[in-house]
Amino acid sequence: QRSLVGSEMCIRDSAGEILYSHVAAGYESISLGEQQLSQLLHMETGEIRIGASDMTLQFYLLPYLEHFHQLYPGIKVHVTNAPTPSTINHLLSGNIDFGIVTSPLPADPHMEIKQAREIEDIFIAGPRFSYLQGKTLDYHELDELPIICLEHDTSTRAYVDTFLSHEGVTLQPEFELSTSDMIAQFVMRNLGIGSIMADFAQSYIDRGDLFRLQFKKPIPKRHMCIISDRRRGMSVAANKLMELL
């Protein structure tokens, strides 16, 4: 009888140990989850995925990222650097939380668009083309000049091409480049007339290295925009950064 009772107690003790181990593991998991949730809510940890072009990163997003990192050093920020069409695809595919892009943008019921700041597209030239400085030009005169511009897969190129087509002009570029910084460098070397966003050219113009071409009808200004996906919520960290923008 003692042996039987002892066996029952042993079984009960073993079952209790097994139950306790599961309960303890569950409690630890819950405790860890609560701790991680608290860290997320208090901006001590987390990550943000952003899409941005060279233009929007340099002339809009970067100062905000610097300020955000000073406020919340524990938050990791991943930036996918790509032109506007690719950034839109990344957003709608769920690869980024939000994007900073340039208009015009395609109509999409899933995409929420918020205008951030105004931008202007201009043409610039170097000393080789000094005879154009101070003149008011017609866009048809671009047909006779070597043109340097961005590649086709950018919103900037699409916008400028569309505007010029309404003016009866189709650009036949000598050089098509992937970044606006390179356009400025090519123009500096007198390789042609550059189609560029004004912000990229301003420092060169201020120093007198390059000058802006003047036209009878300026290209209408457009906007940098913040885009997000209406179908998906964003993390606490992503929402906090959006509040700063």
Tell where the protein language model's regions lie, with residue ranges.
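Alpha-helical "hinge/linker" immediately C-terminal to small N-terminal DNA-binding modules
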Residues: 11-39, 45
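Secondary-structure junction motif
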Residues: 131-133, 138, 146-167, 234-238, ...
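Hydrophobic hinge/microswitch elements
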Residues: 83-96, 102, 156-213
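A late-sequence structural motif
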Residues: 60, 211-245
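Central regulatory/effector-binding core of bacterial HTH transcription factors
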Residues: 45-107, 177
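Short beta-strand->loop
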Residues: 112-122, 207-220
